[in-house]
């Protein structure tokens, strides 16, 4: 499992940073990739990666500002050409209006998609758990931006314990169907009368990962709730320390506000994105240092960067 950032800039494309998009690679877990936001030029960014567009099966949109959605119709159209014979449907989750935005573009341009798009729209009254699979759950909660905007909390369900095959062999259990029974939690009685207690040979379940990905937002308690105990928090940092009033006026956060959210939520790692083009390299270093005075494990991400979870 890993996150790859396709665009880490704010507002409009810049030389060093494209606008918002990232993917959560779940290839080992689901053989899928989930995309979060799809700003202008996202499909061009994908060409610089190993991502196969047909593997992108779910797309989560935080809000309908252009720097988060204008790349979506183009990506969906190009995906049809890049999928070859292995066409896979796409589920799109997002605020009410995302279906109209996408379908108006598709119909007006005459694009033909050889796969189906399944839209899952919501408003402020219909949030909470928006998706559950056998391995993951996704929650959405309203943030505090200039338009309706959400953050997402991706929760991996706990992983089953693993079977200690060597310990079983040492206990005298021959390899075969009985191994499967023990793995499934069933006790087994050997020919000599010895009882193999399954739980003694299976490790404890492993806690699943929690990934929180926020859209644009002012500092708000909703961010803390979404991020509580997360392994990774992806938080915007459009402004820097000292610009709190400006950030609030425009519906955004500063680096230090993001750090306070991370600290309050007891997350393990904070990844800052949505970085304004006005910040130069020395500004970025200072932004990181200022945030680290509040929360230690802070990293300001770059376009195409991958973070393993």
Curated annotation (Swiss-Prot):
Zn(2+) 1 binds at residues 63, 65, 145, 216. Zn(2+) 2 binds at residues 67-68, 216, 274. The active site is at 67 (proton acceptor). It catalyses: Endonucleolytic cleavage of RNA, removing extra 3' nucleotides from tRNA precursor, generating 3' termini of tRNAs. A 3'-hydroxy group is left at the tRNA terminus and a 5'-phosphoryl group is left at the trailer molecule. Keywords: Endonuclease, Hydrolase, Metal-binding, Nuclease, tRNA processing, Zinc. Zinc phosphodiesterase, which displays some tRNA 3'-processing endonuclease activity. Probably involved in tRNA maturation, by removing a 3'-trailer from precursor tRNA. PANTHER family: ZINC PHOSPHODIESTERASE ELAC PROTEIN 1. Homodimer. NCBIfam families: PRK00055.1-3, RNase_Z. This is Ribonuclease Z. It comes from Streptococcus mutans serotype c (strain ATCC 700610 / UA159).
